[in-house]
């Protein structure tokens, strides 16, 4: 068993379709069968099943292992129908052969969806009958859908025990492509819309998808009312159909599809079972293929969250995500306002790979309408930054074009996307409050997606909502403890308008940065941002809760423009005099040339000899990183226009002042190195190897004195 599971795990990594992942979808001869696309894996020991339970109502239920006998076949499909009386011919009203060709060849991208459409219509008919019988207080008959394949005859048959159709209904429902039987039925029951809203969409359109694969379509239908006659509807899709009374017709509807020569694969049982497993596993009614029950999965997103076990969640997650880990977070979200939504979302336990982060694919969430699959990966219902989320969304309000495959990009879809995004953000915020340590690990693994969301989203209010999920270390908190922007804002002193941050590779470099040192005099809390894209993220965010996000590097430049004064309280003998400082700055401007725009004095620094200031340094730094070709020092200087600010109290600056006249060659080496050190501290030098030669010269000069 262990060896088989390991082999299965390795094979499963190559799966492509999210909804063709491991799912116990059927049983044969007492052994669970694991369907993986078109491959089946049989376990040698029937007692070693991946799921337990024997009732169809249980998730991933299998036949009891103890039952050694093969389950008896159950089918209602038989050739009892016979045409009697005259045949009447009708032309499609306003639906010509050309229009039929459009529906059959252009509307659907995959021919296999005709099975999904016909199953949906059968479910529709059963739902109508159930509603009618319940309202009338009558006993419900067997509510079933049956499919039968016949490879010799090249046919596939689908039959339901639903409400059936009269002769007039056959003409109106199947004679007009654009007519919706379900819609008309709902209009007649508007006062009971809540009960009737479960009916699955447009019957007429779905029915005509059969002509993608059919040379001829036979329909036998009989209303559920006693003594009602049955009828045959027959057409080859050429623009004309025939109707005749028929005997031997069971209540409900039976459709026989005579397949085209290039579509004979749909007369193969395994091919049909693959399609049903892909699209219709969650239909509410029992679904049989050649006498065997094939839809054994339960739509757990429609259940009460209290009734779903942890095991069921794990198995369902593995099914929809083609995964082998467990979900770290589970959100079961149900609402009827402002939209009808039944959904389950999972966040994988496994850390995303670089492929997961960089891939251009959209959502990994499947979209259903009343438990019928619409899209395996619905790219429009979640924003791209949430592509790490796995799950299912089921909504009766989703607008569909004639084909269920072509979702309209409408205001309703955008509303659904906004509602789901806000609910997921709220869920993550709640999780951060519930278990901060678990959330911190989640943010470490998935924080890059949130940063992407802020950078790629245009609306400021949505940016700020996503920003509530960001976490950073802070100068006001111990190392390792994270804080949010909301928590930072709550600690701000009255009248403070800015949230300050500093980007550095780690806390040690942040705390020893000349820019953080310059902020200490203000006694202001500073967020420490360590990730590569934090700076770009905060530049795009700009503000949070009406407070500006300011890099401490930018704040220093702004202070200079505002000509804020910082008093130097050190004794006169410990610093250069004002005259010496002015002369030194003039010499440094000349020595550094075009590499600097200006040289100034600063009293913000204590342990650092100098620092570089650039207006909008974060944006400039990001721009330099994005350049394909390395730039020379002169080109960088022209772009950055840096100002070098010197600390007149520092030993290096005082020694430089002494050396500039006594040993000009050594002084030049020293001022070049002070400048380069400041550029490195500012993160404006990607490759420091160019300065190695100068450092060697400085070491030689230092050793020559001994």
UniProtKB/Swiss-Prot annotation:
It holds the Pfam family HATPase_c_3. The modification N6-acetyllysine is found at residues 264, 326, 334, 426, 433, 468. The modification Phosphothreonine is found at residues 176, 496. Disulfide bonds: none annotated. One of its GO terms (biological process) is translational attenuation. GO terms for cellular component: cell periphery; mitochondrial inner membrane; mitochondrial intermembrane space; mitochondrial matrix; mitochondrion. ATP binds at residues 121, 160, 173, 207, 404. Residues 1-60 form a transit peptide. Transmembrane segments: none annotated. Keywords: Acetylation, ATP-binding, Chaperone, Membrane, Mitochondrion, Mitochondrion inner membrane, Nucleotide-binding, Phosphoprotein, Transit peptide. Gene3D superfamilies: 3.30.230.80, 3.40.50.11260, Heat shock protein 90, C-terminal domain, Histidine kinase-like ATPase, C-terminal domain. GO terms for molecular function: ATP binding; ATP hydrolysis activity; ATP-dependent protein folding chaperone; protein kinase binding; RNA binding; unfolded protein binding. Belongs to the heat shock protein 90 family. Binds to the intracellular domain of tumor necrosis factor type 1 receptor. Binds to RB1. Interacts with SRC. Interacts with SDHA. This is Heat shock protein 75 kDa, mitochondrial. It comes from Rattus norvegicus.
């Amino acid at each position: 068993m262990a060896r088989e599971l390991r082999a299965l795990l390795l094979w499963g990594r190559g799966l492509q379709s999210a909804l063709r992942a491991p799912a116990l979808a059927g049983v044969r001869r007492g052994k669970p069968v694991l369907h993986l696309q078109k491959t089946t894996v049989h376990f040698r020991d029937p007692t070693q099943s991946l799921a337990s339970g024997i009732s169809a109502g249980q998730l991933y239920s299998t036949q009891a292992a103890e039952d050694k006998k093969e389950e008896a076949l159950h089918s209602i499909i038989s050739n009892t129908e016979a045409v009697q009386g005259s045949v009447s011919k009708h032309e499609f009203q306003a639906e010509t052969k050309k229009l039929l060709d459009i529906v059959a060849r252009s509307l659907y991208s995959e021919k296999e969806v005709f099975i999904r459409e016909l199953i949906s219509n059968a479910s529709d008919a059963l739902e109508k009958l159930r509603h009618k019988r319940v309202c009338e207080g009558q006993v419900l008959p067997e509510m079933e859908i049956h499919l039968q394949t016949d490879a010799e005859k090249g046919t596939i048959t689908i039959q339901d025990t639903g409400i059936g159709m009269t002769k007039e209904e056959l003409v109106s429902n199947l004679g007009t492509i654009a007519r919706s039987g379900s819609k008309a039925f709902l209009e007649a029951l508007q006062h009971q819309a809540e009960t009737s809203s479960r009916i699955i969409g447009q019957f007429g359109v779905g029915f005509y998808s059969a002509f993608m694969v059919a040379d001829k379509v036979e329909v036998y239908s009989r209303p559920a009312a006693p003594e009602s006659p049955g009828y045959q509807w027959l057409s080859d899709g050429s623009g004309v159909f025939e109707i005749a009374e028929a005997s031997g017709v069971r209540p409900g509807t039976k459709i026989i599809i005579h397949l085209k020569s290039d579509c004979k694969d749909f007369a193969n049982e395994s091919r049909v079972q693959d399609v049903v497993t892909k699209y219709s596993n969650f239909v509410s009614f029992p679904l049989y293929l050649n006498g065997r029950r094939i839809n054994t999965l339960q739509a757990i997103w429609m259940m009460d969250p209290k009734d779903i076990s942890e095991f069921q969640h794990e198995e369902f997650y593995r099914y929809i995500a083609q995964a082998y880990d467990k979900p770290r977070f589970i959100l079961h979200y149900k609402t009827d306002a402002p939209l009808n939504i039944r959904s389950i979302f999972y966040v994988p336990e496994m850390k995303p790979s670089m492929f997961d982060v960089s891939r251009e694919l959209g959502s990994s969430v499947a979209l259903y309408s009343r438990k019928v699959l619409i899209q395996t990966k619905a790219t429009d219902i979640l924003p791209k930054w949430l592509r790490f989320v796995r799950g299912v969304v089921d909504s009766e309000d989703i607008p569909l074009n004639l084909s269920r495959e072509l979702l309209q990009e409408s205001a309703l879809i955008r509303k659904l996307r906004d509602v789901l995004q806000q609910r997921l953000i709220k869920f993550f915020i709640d999780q951060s409050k519930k278990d901060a340590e678990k959330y911190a690990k989640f943010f470490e693994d998935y924080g890059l997606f949130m940063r992407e969301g802020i950078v790629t989203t245009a609306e400021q209010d949505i940016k700020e909502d996503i920003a509530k999920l960001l976490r950073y270390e802070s100068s006001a908190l111990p190392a390792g403890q994270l804080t949010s922007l909301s928590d930072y804002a709550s600690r701000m002193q009255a009248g403070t308008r800015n949230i300050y941050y500093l980007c550095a590779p780690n806390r040690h470099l942040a705390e020893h940065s000349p820019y953080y040192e310059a902020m200490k005099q203000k006694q202001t809390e500073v967020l420490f941002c360590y990730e590569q894209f934090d700076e770009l993220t905060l530049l795009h965010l700009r503000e949070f809760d009406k407070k500006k996000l300011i890099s401490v590097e930018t704040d220093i430049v702004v202070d200079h423009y505002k000509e804020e004064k910082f008093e130097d309280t050190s004794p006169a003998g410990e610093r250069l005099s004002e005259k010496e400082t002015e002369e030194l700055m003039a010499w440094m401007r000349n020595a550094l040339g075009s590499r600097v725009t200006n040289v100034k004095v600063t009293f913000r620094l204590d342990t650092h000899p100098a620092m570089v200031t650039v207006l909008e340094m974060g944006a400039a730094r990001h721009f330099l990183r994005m350049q394909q070709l390395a730039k020379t020092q002169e080109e960088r200087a022209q772009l950055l226009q840096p100002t070098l600010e010197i600390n007149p109290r520092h030993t290096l600056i005082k020694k430089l002042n002494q050396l500039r006249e006594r040993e000009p060659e050594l002084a030049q080496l020293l001022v070049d190195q002070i400048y380069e050190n400041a550029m490195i501290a500012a993160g404006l030098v990607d490759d420091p190897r160019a300065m190695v030669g100068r450092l060697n010269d400085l070491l030689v000069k230092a050793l020559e004195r001994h």
